Amino acid sequence: MIFLDRPYVSDFFLNYLCESGRAVLRTPFTEELSGTCPSERPLNLVDDPDAEKLCRSGERLYSNSENALDWILRRLGNLPQADAIRIMKDKAALRRLLSELDPDFFFQEIPAAELSSTDISSWPRPFVLKPAVGFFSVGVHTIQSDEDWKKALEAVARDAKQSGFPESVVNQTRFLVEQYIRGEEYAVDLYFDEQGEPVILNIFQHRFSSFSDVSDRLYITGEKIIRANLPRFTAWFRKVNARIGARNFPAHVELRVEGDHILPIEFNPLRFAGLCTTDMAAFAFGLNTVDTYLNGKKPDFDTLLAGRKGKTYSMILLDKPKNLPPDARLDTEKLLAAFQHVLEARFINIPELPLFGFLFTETDEDHKDELDRILKSDLTEFLF
């Protein structure tokens, strides 16, 4: 059973849903979307009662956007999947649940009303301030000094007004303070099967331009990243799910690794990489992650990665520069020419997303500097 919502559904995912005939919840958004299907078949739209029956009969659930979680929690609140959603979306509750895996990890939950009066003098620095529920780096701040704290509190007030996500996605009433997690950051698309066993579908390394950078500009994957991390991540997720208890459940998980130490940043329930960027796996090694999960299949990475040694596959998020002039336009020809091999370019115009779009690229060892350049660029060099 598929739940679609704004802000974005890729043509790749939409075409898969049309061709496969998977049941999709009928909403004004999906009715509009059905008329834009790349294939000749429309979406298989089902009304609320039939959708609920399918879900309760054991059909696997998947959503492209966490904006759709409200319906699931409202109509299916007594199902095990709803319990897993609640646990994963509440970062403070998840920290408490997993605390025995890392008993020395510092974290503290604070009501928004108490942020300005909280004494932070004894907290280990750097630390991170973020909403207990959040998405798309909304309200996430790295604090190294008292001045950083002051600026973060000002930004919290501003973010609360400007956030375009519903309350269930970005809850600005409770905040989590936690020690800064050092090490390399990764994002993992996986599902837990009917026995609760983790099945990893893709592993991204999240690259940053600096210590204070919290943007989503660049995610990379490839043979080297997957082979180095697949065994240890699978073992770690097995320990985690012994506490969460998810079954037949997809998730997109962000974590950091320092040496042999793995620490979670956040769990995003019932979906894979946001804004349909999970499609990266199809471009990188021919794997449709959603189809693999819905059909309970397990990827054979030895086969999928054959012949791809030395290749890096990237998802580049083209976020708009701050204070962008209203008449500014992206020079797409110049942008695409900056990369060795663009697998797909997705340019979008969605008011609620401050993005030009996304690029999926393939890069060999001799051209990795192109990734360093785009990571640090504010994209003004590609405007006219």
Predicted regions and their residues:
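Peripheral (often C-terminal) accessory segments that flank ATP-dependent C-N-forming ligase machineries
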Residues: 294-384
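Glycine-rich phosphate-binding loop of ATP-grasp-fold ATP-dependent ligases
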Residues: 127-157, 185-189, 209-225
